[in-house]
Amino acid sequence: MTGIGPILPLYIKEMMGGDAMAVATIVGIIIFIAGATSVTSSLNVSRLAKRISMPRILIIASFVTGVNFILQYLMPEVWTLGFMRGLTGFSLGMIMPLANTILASAVPAEKRTMVVGFSTSFALMGNVAGPMASGAIAMQWGYGMVFWSTAFCFFLAACVIYRKRKII
């Protein structure tokens, strides 16, 4: 979500026109919706994981997140964009808890702290690299390419997880 974050206010302002105060309020509401749905799914994904394998959920959540990013770009108005951000938050909220659980259970107990540390470090680096990349992509090719490239990353992740699911 952080990769799209820096361009979201600009994209919404372009979509709406209008004064900065209204845009800021709407952006805040949309970010809240995405965050709330992400928290909701993160807290409840364990129930789903009791019925469906974690790799399968990761594949589906990654693919759905990719589709949702494309749909966000295609939304004709700001409130449908907000709705799609909510759906994206929901699918995205499943990914980190499951990925961390799979990582933690795949390594011996004595290496678990190190692996979780690396995972957290890379996630935090992504929180920096994502916005930098999206800003550069938006500057070079426009806002639409940020949505498409983010979707591509999630599709790629879904493919990698699918190919490696037997060893997960």
What are these regions (language model features)?
Residues 12-13, 48-49, 133-142:
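Interfacial helix-cap and linker-helix signal at transmembrane-aqueous boundaries
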